């Protein structure tokens, strides 16, 4: 194709000095690719795969950096002495420049992840991704070479060593098993996930290189086999959740489920409905954390990294941001821990989502069938389709647990473990004092908007007519608060039940009636003060039997704690999922529309966890 004009990207609301640090710079490049790939329909879209890309990037950066600047209190993820070649750290071969090693590792990893493969076993490679998408992603990488602090020396031994490190990680962890939806069909029945009533199908181009040509219908089910089949990164054991109310061992928990229905209607409904009791500030909280795969914004792992960037600079060890090796080491370790935890949180939350296939509130309330509980015409506030003229939507994957809650539980618990004893001291299950100021979400930055016409990728978003989202500047007192608000924000959008985040008794105010929780005079749910919250409640599970966490927050915390306690070690090969053919389910009832591709990528759609 001919010359390509870069998509105009709105400026990020953070100090420009952040990217004078080369660890933060390459993190920034990874985050730019996240928002661009979701804008152009490129590879690695959706929450779990976009988290995986950042995890692979920061493991490559971590080992490239610490091979040249060895730490005294931990080791690299790969080992130079292991007998298993798949986990062997390459020889430095004279590499002695950490800056160039990190550049080589980052550029090679990001190119391997986002550029069109030269060789691919699929007989129709890249069928779902346009040439323009790859070209736009290539422009981001080309620009990074020009803007990298200290420059890029591709011929140096250090740069080539970084490339070698990235190659080992890519071969080890680029595991596309389960990303395709081919062979999946929804399971019918009460409590079961199904097509979204407001977006039952999307119309996609038959030829991705001809977006204005013929269209075909496509039903979206994002990565149904991913959690059970893909390689984990650094967890050392299995992680399970309790059964949700209404299913299996908790089939008799009708009071808990019925009260959750009431909360969903009151707190997650569309703004115009009389039954909606959510406050304007709670509506803002729902939008603030969204990052639902929208144009120019991307997915939640991008926002979590933006927050961690601000935390990292706020609590840096030395004042010199650009040149301090102490800060470089600090950031390289922090982002590897955070993004590996985020990756494994995505794997285990997707494993449990598709294990239970629990319906979303939009389906649950509309299909309830009981006149005194459900509403067949109910609408949610919904996941925002920011920078489009589309209506809000229900994510195309099951509810329990919340991906947001699991990702946030893992990310912010890892931050809490990393800074404990440095910013202050706290127990692992109680509030911290990691406060941050001036945190702005791109969902509410005074720039991004709800458009009145289709998005134009050739024009700056500032020049496109629509309702501009108000710029809201936030302060948070702790990572404990970040973790909690991120989780409950999904209740306010109506895309999640309260138990998708955490057990009701851990976050709500009990009443004298079992499994019924307090409301204010307006009928809105009353949440506990964040400093009083502890995620301690456990519930039963049919298989395996036992007591397990309820919801995404404690699942994410559990994953982060395990990774941190074990010092960021690889998941042992013997406990990785066994290679298997993608399961094929026989359709029940109406034959679903065929998937639009059979490729090693998740569907390129707008999605929310």
UniProtKB/Swiss-Prot annotation:
GO terms for cellular component: extracellular region. The N-terminus is blocked. Residues 569-609 are annotated as: Disordered. InterPro entries: Br/Cl_peroxidase_C, P_Acid_Pase_2/haloperoxi_sf, V-haloperoxidase, VCPO_N. Keywords: Chloride, Metal-binding, Oxidoreductase, Peroxidase, Secreted, Vanadium. It catalyses: RH + Cl(-) + H2O2 = RCl + 2 H2O. Its cofactor is vanadate. Vanadate binds at residues 353, 360, 402-404, 490, 496. It holds the Pfam family VCPO_N. Its EC number is 1.11.1.10. GO terms for molecular function: chloride peroxidase activity; metal ion binding. It is an enzyme of class 1 (oxidoreductase). Its main location: secreted. The active site is at 404 (proton donor). It is found in: Secreted. Belongs to the vanadium-dependent haloperoxidase family. Catalyzes the oxidation of chloride in the presence of hydrogen peroxide to hypochlorous acid (ClOH), which in turn can react with a nucleophilic acceptor (RH), to form a chlorinated compound. Homotetramer. This is Vanadium chloroperoxidase. It comes from Curvularia inaequalis (Helminthosporium inaequale).
């Amino acid at each position: 194709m001919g010359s390509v004009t870069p998509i105009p990207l709105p400026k990020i609301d953070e100090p420009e000095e952040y990217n004078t640090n080369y660890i933060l710079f390459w993190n920034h490049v990874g985050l730019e690719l996240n928002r661009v790939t979701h804008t152009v329909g490129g590879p690695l879209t959706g929450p779990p795969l976009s988290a995986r890309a950042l995890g692979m990037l920061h493991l490559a950066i971590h080992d490239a950096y610490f091979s040249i600047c060895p730490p005294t209190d931990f080791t690299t993820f790969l080992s130079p002495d292991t007998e298993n070649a798949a986990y062997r750290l390459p020889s430095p071969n004279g590499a002695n420049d950490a800056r160039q090693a990190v550049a080589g590792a980052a550029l090679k990893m990001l190119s391997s992840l986002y550029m069109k493969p030269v060789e691919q076993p699929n007989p129709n490679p890249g069928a779902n991704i346009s040439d323009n998408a790859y070209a736009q992603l290539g422009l981001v990488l080309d620009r990074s070479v020009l803007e990298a602090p200290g420059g890029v020396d591709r011929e140096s031994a250090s740069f080539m060593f970084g490339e070698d490190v990235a190659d080992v990680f890519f071969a080890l962890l680029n595991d596309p098993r389960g990303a395709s939806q081919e062979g999946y069909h929804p399971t019918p029945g009460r409590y079961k996930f199904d097509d979204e009533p407001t977006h039952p199908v999307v119309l996609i181009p038959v030829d991705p290189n001809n977006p204005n040509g013929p269209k075909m219908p496509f039903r979206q089910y994002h990565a149904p086999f991913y959690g059970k089949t893909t390689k984990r990164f650094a967890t050392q054991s299995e992680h399970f959740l309790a059964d949700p109310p209404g299913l299996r061992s908790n089939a008799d928990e009708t009071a808990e489920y019925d009260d959750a229905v009431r909360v969903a209607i009151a707190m997650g409904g569309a703004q115009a409905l009389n039954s909606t009791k959510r406050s304007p500030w709670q509506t803002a909280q729902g939008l603030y954390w969204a990052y639902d795969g929208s144009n120019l914004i991307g997915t939640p792992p991008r926002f979590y990294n933006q927050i961690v960037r601000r935390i990292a600079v706020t609590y840096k060890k030395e004042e010199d941001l650009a040149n301090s090796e102490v800060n470089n080491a600090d950031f390289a370790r922090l982002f590897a821990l955070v993004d590996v935890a985020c990756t494994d949180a995505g794997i285990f939350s997707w494993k449990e989502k598709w294990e239970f296939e629990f319906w979303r509130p939009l389906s649950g309330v509309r299909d309830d069938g009981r006149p005194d509980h459900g509403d067949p015409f109910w609408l949610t506030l919904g996941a925002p389709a920011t920078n489009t003229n589309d209506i809000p939507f229900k994510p195309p994957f099951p509810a329990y647990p919340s991906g947001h809650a699991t990702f946030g539980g893992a990310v912010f618990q890892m931050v809490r473990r990393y800074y404990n004893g440095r910013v202050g001291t706290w127990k692992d299950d109680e509030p911290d004092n990691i406060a941050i100021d001036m945190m702005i979400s791109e969902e509410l930055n005074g720039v991004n908007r709800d458009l009145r016409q289709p998005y134009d990728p050739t024009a700056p978003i500032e020049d496109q007519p629509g309702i501009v989202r108000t710029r809201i500047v936030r302060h948070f007192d702790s990572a404990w608060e970040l973790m909690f608000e991120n989780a409950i924000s999904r209740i306010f959008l109506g895309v999640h039940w309260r138990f998708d985040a955490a057990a009701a008794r851990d976050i709500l105010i009990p009443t004298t009636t079992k499994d019924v929780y307090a409301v204010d005079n307006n009928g809105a749910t009353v949440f506990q003060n964040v400093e009083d919250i502890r995620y301690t409640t456990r519930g039963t599970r049919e298989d395996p039997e036992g007591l397990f966490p309820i919801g995404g927050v404690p699942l994410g915390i559990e994953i982060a704690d395990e990774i941190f306690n074990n010092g960021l070690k690889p998941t042992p090969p013997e406990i990785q999922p066994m290679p298997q053919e993608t399961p094929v389910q026989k359709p029940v009832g109406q034959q679903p529309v065929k998937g639009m591709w059979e490729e090693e990528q998740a569907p390129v759609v707008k999605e929310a966890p």
